[in-house]
Amino acid sequence: MQIEIKTLDNGSAGTAELPDEIFAATPRADIMARVVHWQLACRRAGTHKVKGMGEVSGTTKKPYRQKGTGNARQGSLRAPQFRTGGAVHGPVVRDHGYDLPKKVRRLGLISALSQKQAEGKLVVIDTAAGMEKTRDLAAKLRALGWRSALIVDGASVDEGFARASRSLLAVDVLPTIGANVYDILNHDVLAITVAGVEALKARLGFGAAEERSAA
């Protein structure tokens, strides 16, 4: 498919060819949900921890004799029914991450890209560079009407541009390798540079070598 290349000044810089296999596929909401759940699970620190009966401080002596007191039998003041007792089946330090097949992750990214294109929220820009001041970048994005935007560049991002965007709320700049389903869906506008489009094609297996073999 053909799409117009925009500039940050809201001008035109020609057209770009986007492969239908990446940007015009049928979005799979179930696959995107699986990938997002996987991403969020992997992001969890897993440092939650409570103390059990064997970890809380206190005596291990039986509080009183088994019979004859009129009270319910007790074996330890560390039991969970007491105020200073340990927790039962509480959270422990662990890794919440799990494996997700590479094909599922790839299909999730393609679905997210196609979803943005179908919604008319996909923009191809000529470059994401030459901007050093946050004030200047904010003015350009405001003129474009981008309140929430994810900008995907090529193999690396321009340091000055990334620094200028760092203080802007709901604006993120990522290299191609960092493009992911969660951030794409979490932003209103997805802006990809020309270099980013080529890098995405290579990352998803639709690079120049495959195009030559198909021809």
Swiss-Prot record:
Cellular component GO terms held in the UniProt record: ribonucleoprotein complex; ribosome
Pfam families xrefs: Ribosomal_L4 (PF00573)
GO molecular function: rRNA binding; structural constituent of ribosome
Domain of life: Bacteria
Region (Disordered): 51-88
Keyword Cytoplasm: no
Gene Ontology biological process terms in this record: translation
InterPro entries to which the protein is assigned, alphabetical: Ribosomal_uL4, Ribosomal_uL4-like, Ribosomal_uL4_dom_sf
Alphabetical UniProt keywords: Ribonucleoprotein, Ribosomal protein, RNA-binding, rRNA-binding
Assembly notes: Part of the 50S ribosomal subunit.
Family: Belongs to the universal ribosomal protein uL4 family.
HAMAP family: Ribosomal_uL4_B (MF_01328_B)
Functional note: One of the primary rRNA binding proteins, this protein initially binds near the 5'-end of the 23S rRNA. It is important during the early stages of 50S assembly. It makes multiple contacts with different domains of the 23S rRNA in the assembled 50S subunit and ribosome.
Name of this chain's protein: Large ribosomal subunit protein uL4
Native source species: Granulibacter bethesdensis (strain ATCC BAA-1260 / CGDNIH1)
Taxonomic lineage of the native organism: Bacteria, Pseudomonadati, Pseudomonadota, Alphaproteobacteria, Acetobacterales
